[in-house]
Amino acid sequence: MATFTVIKMTHFSPLHIGTGKENYDFSASDLHSDTLLSALAAMRVQMGQTENLESFLSSFLLSSAFPFYENRYFLPKMQGKIKIVVKGKAESEYRKSLKKIHYIESELWQKLSRGETLELETIQQIQGDLLLKKEDGISVCKSQVSERVSVSRASEDAEPFFFDWKFFDRKAGLYCLTDAKGELLDEIIQLFILLGETGLGTDKNIGGGKFY
C-alpha cells in the first residue's frame, strides 16, 4: 500500500488565490497541485538548480492543498450525490446546506467513499463549506473583502476595485500529501520552507500568502 507524507502550511498571512479572471473580489477555495508544483519549481530555480527540472517534478506525486484545523484534516467533497441525512429533519430542511459543502472531515469522508450513509446529529455539523464530525463551531478561515484603488500609469486615473483576503485561524492552515521519500522528501520540504518565506497567491510583494 502506498504511503504519503503530510506537509502542513501553517500561520498564514492573508491569502488570495486567483481564479484566473481579472476580478479580485473572490478568492478561489482550491489551491491546485499544478499551482503548488509550479511554485516549487520556481523556488528550485531561485536556488540555482535549473537542470533536470522536468525529471524532478515527475519524480513524485503531490496533491492539491486542503484545509486542516489542529489535527483534523478535510478532503474535498466527492463528485455526485452524497448520502447524508440529519436526525429528525426532513431533507427539504437541510438540502441547501448540503449543497454548500466543499470539504468533509477525513473520518466522514472515508465513510462516504465506502458508500455509507451519514446520519448527522445536527445541521450545525455543517459550518460554512465544511462538514464536521462533531458540532463544535470551528472555523478554518474567514473571508474579508476590502476596497482598493488601482492607478493606471498611462492616464493616472484611479479605479476602485474589491479584493478578497482569506484570514486563517492560528490553529488552521492548508496541507498537501506527497509520496516522496528520503532525500527527495527532504528537498521538497526545504522548497516549501522557501516558498513559505516568499509567499503563495496574489500580492506576495506586500506579504500575502506567507506561511511556516
Tell me the role of every PLM-derived stretch.
Residues 1-212:
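Conserved active-site/ligand-binding neighborhood in enzyme cores
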